[in-house]
């Protein structure tokens, strides 16, 4: 180690300082952290050194201070625990050494210092002016190196720099706040309590599709239009649907009427056994073929009336026109009305409204004729299936059939009255009770 007093011929020139517990040499250039806070914190590194080259008989006083290495300001890069720092930029703070802290042992001989070494315990550092003694004022993010001053009893002093031990100061509070801030940001973005940004719903304006004239749709609208507000039925097809919902299908109505006819016939009113036999026959759907044929003929006539009503001139015209292609059949070409209405969509639309009015009047007349025909048919059905006076008299005689079940119930009550005393007398003998019960039965 060189000294600033090397030009003087004194024994201080040969002093050597080594750090105890460290194998580092002066060629090492990495830094060790010294945490600084507003309050006093003790230096985490051991300030314990061995000394060589002192005069054993002379008295020496040893003190320590921290000096700036360079004019750079350092920046942390990498792991916080690793202490990876590098010079970042020039520092605006001038290079000044800290105050010296004198060892508590005072003046001691060179032999004693070389034997025990020198140790500075509980030296604190702070980034503000400390209120306590034995505390050094340091700047954050700057590099320092310890310097030992040897003072003899004659007043000669020598400073020895310990280059094998370098420090860089960092603020614990600032680094922890940065880590805390980063952790908070991570929780806000990925944690369960992360703030959810409202979703922006984009509305795209749909393109307006122009309507295309279609003659088939116009005719369908004509069939779905009601004849008038006072009319009971919209069309024969609608009437048939309502009739099916009200009375069921034709086969169900046929079966229901045949059951009633057979139950009211004079042949089935002769005795209760015959009535039970007729009910069994009706449950098996074995009906009279003659009545079923008459009902089939009636409803076939009704279906024929519906089919004749649905066929109108507009149906024939719509079949001869191909709506998907611009071609015309021979029937439409020979007809002058088609040539006049197919000139343009407007003309076709006008003719469709005219045909709509005529079809409404025609449908109204056909519906009136259809209703008259329905009245006539159902009157015939009522006359055909209305029971005669003889059948009604036979039905009144059916009340006498209830006497037989009453007599049977009286006999069963008498039987129970005969069994009850036997059960009370022979409770202990179970075999006698069962024997008496089977004999009575």
Swiss-Prot record:
Polar residues composition bias: residue spans: 273-284
Top-level taxon of origin: Eukaryota
UniProt subcellular location: Nucleus
Region (Disordered) location: 268-289
Keywords assigned by UniProt, alphabetized: DNA-binding, Nucleus, Transcription, Transcription regulation
Family matches, as SUPFAM superfamilies: p53-like transcription factors (SSF49417)
GO BP, sorted A to Z: cell fate specification; positive regulation of DNA-templated transcription; regulation of transcription by RNA polymerase II
GO cellular component: chromatin; nucleus
Main location: nucleus
A GO MF term: RNA polymerase II cis-regulatory region sequence-specific DNA binding
Residue ranges of the annotated DNA-binding region, renumbered to this chain: 18-199
Official protein name in the record: Putative T-box protein 32
Organism expressing this protein natively: Caenorhabditis elegans
Gene: tbx-32
């Amino acid at each position: 180690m060189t000294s600033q007093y090397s030009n003087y011929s004194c024994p201080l020139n040969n002093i050597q300082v080594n750090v105890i517990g460290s194998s580092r040499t002066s060629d090492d250039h990495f830094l060790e952290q010294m945490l600084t806070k507003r309050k006093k914190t003790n230096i985490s590194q051991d300030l314990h050194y061995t000394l060589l080259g002192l005069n054993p008989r002379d008295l020496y006083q040893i003190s320590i201070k921290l000096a700036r290495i360079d004019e750079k300001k350092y920046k942390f890069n990498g792991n916080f625990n690793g202490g990876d720092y590098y010079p970042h930029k020039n520092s605006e703070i001038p290079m000044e050494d800290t105050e010296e802290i004198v060892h508590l042992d005072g003046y001691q001989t060179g032999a004693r210092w070389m034997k025990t070494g020198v140790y500075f315990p509980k030296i604190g550092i702070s980034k503000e002016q400390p209120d306590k003694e034995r505390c050094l004022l340091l700047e954050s993010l700057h590099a320092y190196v310890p310097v030992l001053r040897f003072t003899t009893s004659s007043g000669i002093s020598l400073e020895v720099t310990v280059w094998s031990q370098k420090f860089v100061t960092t603020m614990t509070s600032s680094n922890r706040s940065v880590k805390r801030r980063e952790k908070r940001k991570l929780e806000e973005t990925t944690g369960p309590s992360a703030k959810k940004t409202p979703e922006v719903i984009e509305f795209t304006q749909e393109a307006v599709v122009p309507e295309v004239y279609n003659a088939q749709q116009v005719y369908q609208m004509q069939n779905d239009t009601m004849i008038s507000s006072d009319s009971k039925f919209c069309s024969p097809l609608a009437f048939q649907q309502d009739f099916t919902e009200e009375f069921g299908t034709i086969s169900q109505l046929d079966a229901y009427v045949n059951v009633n006819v057979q139950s009211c016939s004079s042949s089935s009113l002769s005795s209760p056994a015959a009535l039970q036999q007729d009910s069994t026959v009706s449950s098996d759907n074995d009906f009279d073929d003659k009545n079923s044929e008459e009902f089939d003929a009636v409803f076939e006539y009704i279906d024929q009336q519906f089919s004749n009503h649905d066929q109108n001139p507009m149906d024939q015209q719509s079949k001869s026109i191909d709506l998907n292609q611009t071609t015309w059949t021979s029937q439409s070409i020979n007809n002058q009305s088609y040539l006049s209405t197919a000139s343009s969509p407007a003309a076709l639309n006008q003719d469709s409204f005219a045909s709509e009015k005529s079809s409404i009047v025609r449908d109204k007349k056909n519906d009136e004729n259809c209703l008259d025909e329905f009245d006539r048919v159902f009157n015939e059905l009522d006359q055909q299936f209305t029971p005669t006076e003889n059948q009604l008299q036979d039905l009144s005689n059916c009340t006498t059939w209830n006497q037989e079940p009453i007599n049977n119930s009286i006999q069963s009550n008498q039987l129970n009255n005969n069994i009850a005393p036997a059960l009370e007398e022979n409770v202990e003998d179970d075999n006698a009770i069962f024997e008496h019960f089977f004999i009575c039965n």
